[in-house]
Amino acid sequence: MYFKKSRISPMTRLSLPLIAAGLILSGCNDTRDLAPERADRAWHPHKSTGLSLPASIRSPSFTAGSDGVNAGGNTSALMTRPDHPGMVLPENQDRALSLPQLIDLAERNNPRTRVAWEAARQAAIGVGMSRAAMLPQLTFSAMGGFQRMALPLPNYLSSRGYLTSNGAAAFPKLELDYLLLDFGRTRAQINEAKYQTLAANFGFSAVHQQLILDVISAYHAQQAAQAIVAASHHAVENMAILLQSAQSRHDHGEATIIDVATAQRNLAQARFDLDKANDAEHGARHALLEVTGLPATLPLAIDAMPARALPRSTPGQIRQLVDQALASRPDLMADIAKLRASDEAVLASKAALRPRVAFAGTASGYLGGLKTYGTGRNAPASTIAQPEAGAFLQVSWPIYQGGLRANAIHMAESRRDEAEATLLKDRLSIERQVADSQDALETALAQVKSAEVLNRAAQTANDGATQAYAHGVGTMTDASTAAAALFEAQAALAVSTAQAFTKAAALAHATGQLDLVNNVPDTLSDSVP
């Protein structure tokens, strides 16, 4: 019995290797090994990832500038460009930095200001991108290549039954599209971008105000930490005097060994508190340098806070302060700008329901040649190089898109309602912040007064108890208690004083008055470019 051998078509023979290659390649595309192997172990790369800090960030360059301060308290301009990647430092680094200089350095160095600035610049660029839709759009394109074609023919026309043609051509083309009318859609999109820019600019101001508050808070925290270090040194000196008195009285048989041991314990505790205070001061200094945008290891001296009167509180003007905050807070102004932007987005989505009218024009050319074989005689090659042009008035009006445009309107309206709710939420939050800041300032000022009385009383009690013990009419317990109370009183006075100035700055921030320049227009419509 014979079986007829099956024949595999050339197309099948060509397809089988391609299918096999596709299956093999798809099996090679398993990328699960790129994820961590186990859920209960931290991931570590098996080989170098090629990731490293850029040189400008790993070892930033420093730009020296002037550290002088004019009579108005503003630092003079430093020799650096706004887009310079290096850090700005004072020219004379041996001089201690004052609070205005620290604020100026923070505004120049802290990355938060650059992030907010770039966001504002991106929003401004977005206005230009939206305006581009109203300008003529020119597009040039070109295509060229070679093509071989085959066409079957009857035998009486071609002895081989087909003819072939080889062609090579290039097609340059210039297209023009110019929007004539879209019933306000593009204009609404431009206005939306403008309001978004305004919101980003107010956000930039809010970042600066928050940064100023952070510098002030860190500065006064560092000053309080320094005062606690000084109080700790004083406590060590007092405990050393008590130990000397206890040892002297013990040598003369007037004190027990328990008094000496108690004095030694108190001195050790005072030294422990001093070490802890030094560590806290180092941490406060590092935090201040960080918020200033400088490395924590940079050896810069911080100027002590000059003696000045405590800030004042005006409890009867809380409504005035709230109104001032509602008119000046940049974050609230940003919310208003975002609300206006969402209004324009609603208008743009509704305008999308209307037709779009545009002018379109084309200018192109065909440059190429064609040669045909198989007609029984050699045909000469034909070439062409001719221009083509056209002008059109184009009207596009989508009739049905499955509810896409209606849902776009619903989405824009929902975002508008969200922006309005956010504005209301932030308004209530600002009122609470003003009230809380006012109460916190009043409390801090009251604590300063109490701490001053406490400090004077503790100083008097410590002097008396120390002298009494030294003359044999007091006890070690009373002297130790008085010395510890003096340290606590001095620390409380330092902390409460720093808190008073910090709370005053927080109140200025809550009312939007913390920056040096505060020029907010009455209506946002006047500020739209």
Placement of each model-derived feature along the sequence:
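Short amphipathic coiled-coil heptad-repeat segments
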Residues: 58, 65-69, 73, 78-83, ...
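Amphipathic alpha-helical coiled-coil scaffold segments and their short linker/junction regions
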Residues: 102-107, 163, 259, 264, ...
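Acidic, low-complexity, intrinsically disordered peripheral segments
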Residues: 2-4, 29-57, 148, 296, ...
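Sec/SRP-type N-terminal targeting helices
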Residues: 114-115, 131, 166, 180-208, ...
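C-terminal motif of bacterial Sec signal peptides marking the signal peptidase cleavage site
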Residues: 25-27
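Bacterial Sec-pathway N-terminal export signals of envelope proteins
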Residues: 29-135, 139, 303-340, 398-399, ...
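Small/polar, glycine/serine/threonine/aspartate-rich low-complexity segments that form flexible
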Residues: 84-95, 141-175, 305-315, 347, ...
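Periplasmic alpha-helical coiled-coil/stalk elements that build and connect Gram-negative outer-membrane
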Residues: 29, 206-324, 440, 444, ...
